[in-house]
Amino acid sequence: KLGEQPRSFKDFLRIITGSKGGEGASVSDQINVLGSHTIGYDFCLAYSGSDWNAKGYYQHICSDKSGTEFRNGADGLWGMEFAFPKFKWIEKVVVEYMCTRNQSGPFHLIDFDHKAHPGRGGGGDNYYNNGEYTTGNSYFGKAVGSSLILSPEYNTNHSTGFRDNRIQDFHFALKGALSPRVDYKLRLTVMNGWGTHAA
């Protein structure tokens, strides 16, 4: 978007360590971090018994420092999985809840003049989008990550960004066997979308 980006080895180290950009970076990358980042933390508790197994998990999503500090609430994927290896009718049950509505709040709150306006910023994380890279977290118009975040290839106005990244969904899945020759999988996903904080 903005022409040539910083590309020295020092800039590479800034990107992989999530550090602020140097003098050659845009003002935005000097205030936040250099480059575009999507970060995830995975937490899981599991139980294995003789007749059944259970797993509870949370995958925290964030795209900047405010999210790494969990200032984006409970955004991410919450799930439970139950497996019954000895009970073929229902071998596995999965229940998941995903929410990306908080995004550290609706406003970015980072003023570019930090000497005149010191303090913490954050908010308006705008998942999957990036101010420096207009195609955001996509590859040839397709979302890299959750398939529930509508890919830019579906934008009727041909814009390259993500227009609906604030979602809430519930996902249910069953897997089993009705007989030795008949397996089944049932899946149901119910979702709502709220566009972006800016929309």
Descriptions of predicted regions:
Residues 1-113, 170, 190-194, 198:
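Signature for the C-terminal beta-barrel architecture of outer-membrane proteins
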